[in-house]
Amino acid sequence: MAGGVAAAGLALGATILLWWAIDETHFPRTDAAFDQLTDTLSAIPGVTLDGSERWVESPTFSDARAWIGATVDESALDAVREAACLSPYPDDVDWALRVSTDGGNAVTLSIGEEGTGPCPLVGLDAAPLFDRLDDVVTGLALYANVQADGRLSLLAEEDPADGVGGLLPLVAHAEDLRDAAGMDSTTAVEVGAPSLGVVVAAGEQERLSAMLSALVDEHGVTRYFADGGPQIDGVDKVQVVAPAEEHRAVEARVRDSGLPVADLPVRFLPSD
């Protein structure tokens, strides 16, 4: 009987450990220095603290993680960076900073690099990027980040009112935005939105912009995706939404573009 109880106890313990291993529940861990940091940020003019958290996860319940989200006027970004970097809080912080630019855009910077402590190191020159972005578009909400492969990623949260056409200035000025961000001239730029997904390689912005403009203005294309992302069938392709009577002309435009996508199969998606 005792052996059975022991076995049952071991089984229960193993089940609990397994549950802990897959459970992602956050267990709060308060810290005075972290609270001081969030209080300091909240007091900066032009900063609205959207949320903050410091927690541990099962099964180790160690190595606390921290996150801070804030909406920041562009003019207050340097003050946020200074307050964070001078904070006595010693550990890494994951940041989500939504910056309201002077030109009416909203750019979210997701920042979190191991070993940087609380300092929000963006990986790009934010202020010049915002200035150039404001010259190109207005009223867009974007995520701007440096991806693991080094590319600059500019992803719109929603399509603008005029659809994919309103995103084409980002493609036409992709290399200008990259340069403003202080990145190497060989760096590719990913431009994405619900209706668009492209990667602008170095030297391609003019040809890609011209092709996309023709597809939208002359052939009624409302969605275009060729960003090199994972495909369900493992086959790279160009995916397009366009009127049926324009399919042949759309494919011809892609074939004649001289871009790397010219050799990819073109697949037409159903209209919304």
Annotated model-derived regions:
Residues 37-99:
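N-terminal Sec/ER secretory leader and immediately downstream segment
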Residues 1-11:
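N-terminal export and membrane-targeting signals
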Residues 12-40:
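C-terminal region of N-terminal signal peptides and the immediate post-cleavage residues
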Residues 94-169:
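Non-cytosolic head/periplasmic domains of membrane-anchored proteins
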Residues 180-272:
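Extracytoplasmic/luminal low-complexity segments enriched in Pro/Gly and acidic/polar residues
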Residues 40, 78-88, 167-178, 211-215, ...:
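Short amphipathic alpha-helices in soluble, non-transmembrane regions
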Residues 42-50, 89-92, 133-139, 216-223:
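Short secondary-structure junctions
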Residues 44-67, 141-154, 222-239:
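Short edge beta-strands and adjacent turn/loop segments
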